[in-house]
Every structure is written in C-alpha cells, then in structure tokens.
Amino acid sequence: MFTLPYYLPQNLNKCIISESKTLEKNSLIYAQGEKPKEFYFLKQGLVGLYHSLENGKETLTRLYHANEYFGFRTIFSETSYHCSAKVLMEADIVRIFPGNHANFIANNPDFSCYLMKQLSNELLMQNTE
C-alpha cells in the first residue's frame, strides 16, 4: 500500500475548519444519499464507509485510519454521498467546509495535488487487487 505524508487541516487556506470532535463507536458521520457540505480529516480512530442496497444489506467498501481525509470525493464531484460513514473505533474528526470549490482548489494547490495523489494511489490499488 502507498503511504502519503499527511497534510494537516490547519495548513488549508480560505475555508472554515471546525474544532476536533470526538465521536463514539457506531456514530453516524453522514448518511448515504445526503448532500455534502464538508469533508473530513480523521485525527485518530477508525471510520468505515458502508453502501446500502435496496434490500437493506450493507457492504463495507472502505476503511479510513488516523491522518486520512474522507468525504472529499463526493463534495468535489457535487453529488450525494454514495455510502454512509460510521465510526468503528472512537474517533477524533475535523470538519472542513471548503465553500466555493474552484476557489478552494486555487487557494490550496499543494493540498489539491495531495488529494490527486491519494485518488491516483487508490485507483492503482483497486486495479491491482
């Protein structure tokens, strides 16, 4: 697996960043079908993404560990969440509200490159599994 050095939220420009919030195991962060307003940085803990089928069955699609971002794929694609995010181990989470997406990307070029590398590595890993 590829490991990228993580990029701290406090280094982001022209966006609103929440204080870290501790969420207990089984807490719902966001639900499948909701429209996103923010994305997240996991300071510590474990978060799972679950996709629900029409028959009610849930499938774990991805795990996020400490120092990873999640929820950004959906917010930048301007769609609804395709999965629900749930806390699997007590987690400290920072919410990031980017506002205008084009401005956020322009004001955070290093972070934008970081996210592109993360997406590229995830695609590469999916193609080799």
Curated annotation (Swiss-Prot):
Listed transmembrane segments: none
Protein name as it appears in the record: Uncharacterized protein HI_0804
Pfam families reported in the protein's UniProt record: cNMP_binding
InterPro entries reported for this sequence: cNMP-bd_dom, cNMP-bd_dom_sf, RmlC-like_jellyroll
Alphabetical list of PROSITE patterns matching this protein: CNMP_BINDING_3
Species for this entry: Haemophilus influenzae (strain ATCC 51907 / DSM 11121 / KW20 / Rd)
Coiled coil: none
CDD domains in UniProt: CAP_ED
Disulfide pairings: none
